[in-house]
Structures are given as structure tokens and as C-alpha cells.
């Protein structure tokens, strides 16, 4: 029979053991938190820059895309202080919007406009502010709230741009375009100044592959995905008279195929379990890159980043933890639902004519705008042919309208020549990114032939004064 003293000694021992275990567990928890903190420190901060580069109601889809992206980032855990939004902000409360204060990105979709910060709006949405924001140059921005990317060598940056594009450039609603060479030089400056750890760029625009092809270096820790290659259009979706259509009262396209593919994928998936490469293939299949009539999603830059999880850039939504992926999600969008972005302004005006009472002032104004737009396009088509003939001193110049360089080469070697001709074409011929600037590839061909720049500028002035 054991003594009371023996029982007491056992109890003391067990008590000491419990205290030791508790302290050990506490120490382990503290160590685990230290490791977690260390990991977070190593990962740094996630920054995002979102740019809708257009204005006017018929371009509804670009601001819808950007607003949708913002909602994904916020649900993913990014803070407003680390998200910078560029958008003209003329859609939500446009007199043409039948749902004031609301923007949707898909039929029967929820409002994506609510809560979106207005960092840079109206004339502040321009290329100079865009570059200065990326470079963290607070003194260089004008208008807006002055927010810039204050990133460092441990931070990851996500850039998403949605708008019109053309060979060698993407648009802004005011001022100059974002030229491919200039943009890549900004990225190289950011790398040299150690402004980031890794960067992901998504670009929704026609001929968007030309922004990086043969230009973006592979050693910058930058991974870029474009809606189209350097030679083709991207596509609008959820458009009137297509399937599935938008609510009839909205009257224009709600989204773009590339954009809604990555956005809707991100809405559903657990981003901590999906890699950049996996999303690339999901988006590529949904856009229908295997079908000749659609655009071909392209990727450029640092290939070793393909295994990175999307959560490192756009965060993760805890609500998606139990999502089960199904291949049906990545099925191609029906061709019947696609519209060439350069035709969307025409479609928009046609819809206005159909909806307006016959003979009304609204109907007559829309008919006049439609006729003017069609005539302007015919004039641009003729002007570019005349420019080519006058520049290269040849009569058969049709091949210069469509010929492109070998895959992997940049659009042009002499970017100063290219920018000069593009600006001249805009100023003298009224070419805009909505239509006329689709011919910038032909201007690049002139530069690549070594034709004198002054001679071509003179040809542009002459052709557009006929």
C-alpha cells in the first residue's frame, strides 16, 4: 500500500509535467508565429494597379472588368492602401446607364462598382500618371489622390489593364498612348531600383501581344499574359444580339473574353491552390485559343514563375476553400457570343437606333453618328493606302497592310520612328484607337523598311488632306 507522501510526490510530478507541457506548447506556438511572421515578411506586401483605359458608355465593359478585379483583390485580402485604380468613372452614373450607380460584368451579375476607390479619374487617367504611380514618384502625379506604389524588394505587384489596343500600343482615355517600348523601359527601371520581388501583368487589348513580344526580358521576374497575340483582335462578350446577352436595357457589351475568363475563374477557385500556369490554360481554353476565329492568349517573361500560386499576387478568398474544379468551367465561349471590339461602337449605335422611337431626335442623332463613323472609317482605310504608296513609292502596297515580322521579334526596331508616325497619323488623319490605329502595324513596316521619317510624315499630311 502506497504512502500519502508517495501520492503527494506523484501529484507534484504530474503538475510539473503539465506546466512543462503547457510552456513547451506556448513556446512552440510562439515559434510558429515567428515563422509565420518571418514568412509574411519574406513575402512582403501585395500591390495591385488596375487600369481601365477608355471612357464613354459604349466602352462599359472595360470599367466593368476593372471593378470586378478590384472586388476579387479585396476578397483576397489586399488592402485599399495597396490597390491603385485608374478609371474615367463616367459609366456608373452616366445618363445612359439604366441602373445608376451600378456596374455589372456579366448577365445577372452583382454590382461590381460598389466600394471601388476613385484614385485616378477623368483626365488623371493618363500615361504620365500611370508610369509615375508604378515608379512610386509622388511628385510626378497630377490630379487624383496622389497614391503611388510604395513597394520594395520583397513585394509582389499585379498590374491589370483593360482597354483598346493596336500594334505597339495600348490606349488611355486622355493624352498619349502607352507605347510598348516606353512601358517596358519603366518595368526595367522598377527592376533596377528593386521596386518588387515578382510582378504579374494581365493585358486585355487588341494586338496586346505586341506590348511584350521581343521586348520583355526574361530575367526581370515579370510574367505577362495578353488577351491576344501581336496580330489579332481580342473580343467583347455578353453583348447585345449575342448569347448570353446583357440585360436589354444596358445596350452594350458587359465584358471581354480574356478578362471575364480569368475573373470568373478567380471568383470560384482557391487561389492558394491554383498556379499561374493553371489559370493560363483555363483562360486559354475558355477564350478558345484553339479556334482560328478567336484570339490566342499569349504569355511572356520569366517562365520559372509559372508554378507560383495566384494567391501570391491577387490573394485568396476563404469562401473558395472547398471549391471543386470542373473542366466544364473552362469550355470555350461560344463564337456566337463574341464581338470584335472595333465593331462595338457601331453595334451600340445600331441598338440606339432600334430602341429609339422612329423619327425621334434621338433616332436621328444616332443615325447621323453611325453614318459619320462609317464614313470616317472609309476615309481612314483610303488614307493608309495612300500613305503607303506615297511613302514607299510603290503602287502595290497591300502586303504592307497585313505583313508581320517573324514570331518572337518586336514590332519595330526604331521606336522613335514609330512614335513619330503614329502621332502624325493621329493628328493629321484623325486616327483613333477605336479604329484607325489598327493600322499602326503598317506604319511599323514603313519604319522597318528604313524609309525616311520626314518623307513619311509629309506623305501622311498629303494623304489626309486629299
From Swiss-Prot:
Family note: Belongs to the peptidase C13 family.
Matches recorded under PANTHER family: HEMOGLOBINASE FAMILY MEMBER, VACUOLAR-PROCESSING ENZYME DELTA-ISOZYME
Signal sequence range: 1-24
GO cellular component: extracellular space; plant-type cell wall; protein storage vacuole
Gene3D superfamilies assigned: 1.10.132.130, 3.40.50.1460
EC number: 3.4.22.34
Cystine connections: 239-253, 417-447, 429-464
Function: Asparagine-specific endopeptidase that may be involved in processing of proteins targeted to vacuoles. Probably involved in post-translational proteolysis of seed storage proteins in the protein storage vacuole of developing seeds. Exhibits a caspase-1-like activity in extracellular granules. At the early stage of seed development, required for the formation of the seed coat, by regulating cell death of specific cell layers in inner integument.
Active-site residues, as the UniProt record annotates them: 164, 206 (nucleophile)
UniProt GO molecular function: cysteine-type endopeptidase activity
Tissue: Seed specific. Restricted to developing seeds at 7 days after anthesis, and, at lower levels, detected in flowers. Detected in siliques, specifically in seed coats (at protein level).
A Pfam entry, by short name: Peptidase_C13
Name of protein: Vacuolar-processing enzyme delta-isozyme
Inactivation phenotype: No macroscopic phenotype, probably due to functional redundancy. In plants lacking all vacuolar-processing enzyme isozymes (e.g. alpha, beta, gamma and delta) shift of storage protein accumulation from normally processed polypeptides to a finite number of prominent alternatively processed polypeptides cleaved at sites other than the conserved Asn residues targeted by VPE. Delayed cell death of the two layers of the seed coat.
Site feature: Required for post-translational maturation and enzyme activity: 253
PTM text: Auto-catalytic activation.
Localization: Secreted, Extracellular space; Secreted, Cell wall; Vacuole
Activation/inhibition comment: Strongly inhibited by biotin-YVAD-fmk (a caspase-1 inhibitor) and by Ac-DEVD-fmk.
Keyword terms, alphabetized: Cell wall, Disulfide bond, Glycoprotein, Hydrolase, Protease, Secreted, Signal, Thiol protease, Vacuole
GO biological process: programmed cell death; proteolysis involved in protein catabolic process; seed coat development; vacuolar protein processing
Residues glycosylated per entry: 137, 322
Amino acid at each position: 500500500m502506497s504512502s500519502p507522501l508517495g501520492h503527494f510526490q506523484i501529484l507534484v510530478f504530474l503538475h510539473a509535467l503539465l506546466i512543462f507541457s503547457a510552456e513547451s506548447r506556448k513556446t512552440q506556438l510562439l515559434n510558429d508565429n515567428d515563422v509565420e511572421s518571418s514568412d509574411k515578411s519574406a513575402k512582403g506586401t501585395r500591390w495591385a494597379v488596375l487600369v481601365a483605359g477608355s471612357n464613354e458608355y459604349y466602352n462599359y465593359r472595360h470599367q466593368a472588368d476593372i471593378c470586378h478585379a478590384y472586388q476579387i483583390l479585396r476578397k483576397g485580402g489586399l488592402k485599399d492602401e495597396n490597390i491603385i485604380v485608374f478609371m474615367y468613372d463616367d459609366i456608373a452614373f452616366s445618363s445612359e446607364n439604366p441602373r445608376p450607380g451600378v456596374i455589372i460584368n456579366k448577365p445577372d451579375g452583382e454590382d461590381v462598382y460598389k466600394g471601388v476607390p476613385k484614385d485616378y479619374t477623368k483626365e488623371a487617367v493618363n500615361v504620365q500618371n500611370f508610369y509615375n504611380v508604378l515608379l512610386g514618384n509622388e511628385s510626378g502625379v497630377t490630379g487624383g489622390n496622389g497614391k503611388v506604389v510604395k513597394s520594395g524588394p520583397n513585394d509582389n505587384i499585379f498590374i491589370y489593364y483593360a482597354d483598346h489596343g493596336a500594334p505597339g500600343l495600348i490606349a488611355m482615355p486622355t493624352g498619349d498612348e502607352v507605347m510598348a517600348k516606353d512601358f517596358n523601359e519603366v518595368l526595367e527601371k522598377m527592376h533596377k531600383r528593386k521596386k518588387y520581388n515578382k510582378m504579374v501583368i494581365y493585358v486585355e487589348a487588341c494586338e496586346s501581344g505586341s506590348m511584350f513580344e521581343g521586348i520583355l526580358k526574361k530575367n526581370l521576374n515579370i510574367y505577362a499574359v495578353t488577351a491576344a497575340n501581336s496580330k489579332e483582335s481580342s473580343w467583347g462578350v455578353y453583348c447585345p444580339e449575342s448569347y448570353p446577352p446583357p440585360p436589354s436595357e444596358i445596350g452594350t457589351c458587359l465584358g471581354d473574353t480574356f478578362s471575364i475568363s480569368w475573373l470568373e475563374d478567380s471568383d470560384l477557385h482557391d487561389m492558394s491552390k491554383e498556379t499561374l500556369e493553371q489559370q493560363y490554360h483555363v483562360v486559354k481554353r475558355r477564350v478558345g485559343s484553339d479556334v482560328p476565329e478567336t484570339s490566342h492568349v499569349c504569355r511572356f517573361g520569366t517562365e520559372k514563375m509559372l508554378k507560383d500560386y495566384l494567391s501570391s499576387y491577387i490573394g485568396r478568398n476563404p469562401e473558395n476553400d472547398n471549391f471543386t474544379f470542373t473542366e466544364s468551367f473552362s469550355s470555350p465561349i461560344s463564337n456566337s457570343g463574341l464581338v470584335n471590339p472595333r465593331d462595338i461602337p457601331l453595334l451600340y449605335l445600331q441598338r440606339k437606333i432600334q430602341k429609339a422611337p422612329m423619327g425621334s431626335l434621338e433616332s436621328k442623332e444616332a443615325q447621323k453618328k453611325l453614318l459619320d463613323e462609317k464614313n470616317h472609317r472609309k476615309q481612314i482605310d483610303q488614307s493608309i493606302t495612300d500613305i503607303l504608296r506615297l511613302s514607299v513609292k510603290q503602287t502595290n502596297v497591300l502586303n504592307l497592310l497585313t505583313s508581320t515580322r517573324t514570331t518572337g521579334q518586336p514590332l519595330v526596331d526604331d521606336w522613335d520612328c514609330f512614335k513619330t508616325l503614329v502621332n502624325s497619323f493621329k493628328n493629321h488623319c484623325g486616327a483613333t484607337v477605336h479604329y484607325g490605329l489598327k493600322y499602326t502595324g503598317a506604319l511599323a513596316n514603313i519604319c522597318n523598311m528604313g524609309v525616311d521619317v520626314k518623307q513619311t510624315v509629309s506623305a501622311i499630311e498629303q494623304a489626309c488632306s486629299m
